[in-house]
Amino acid sequence: MRVVMTDEEQQLPEAKWYILHTYSGYENLVKVNLETAFQKNNIEDRLVDIRIPMEDIVEEKNGKRKIVHRRMFPSYVLVKMIYTRDMWHLITGTRGVTGFVGPQGKPTPLTEEEIRRMQLEKVTV
């Protein structure tokens, strides 16, 4: 199995996936606020991707089936970025963000196995 990266990702090999914890229901606002914060601080080149993984669920209500679009990981946002220590306050100070997921709230990048299981990267066989 081989991971295929886009041109943008190849230019930023040190970019890694991190998970941010957010207030419930603030995931989309956090995404917009992070993009804005990176732009205002002229570091948008360090931000590769922000994702809120969604899934379609079939619900049955009153005998009718309906497809509902739901967050796979409520209260979490996945961010691929080039992380540096000076960004910690920028990210954790973003409205809606409660912190990084990791031991003692320290930014911990996802492992290759976690990235594969979450299907965050394009993979070819």
Report residues per predicted region.
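Acidic-enriched and Gly/Ser
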Residues: 2-125
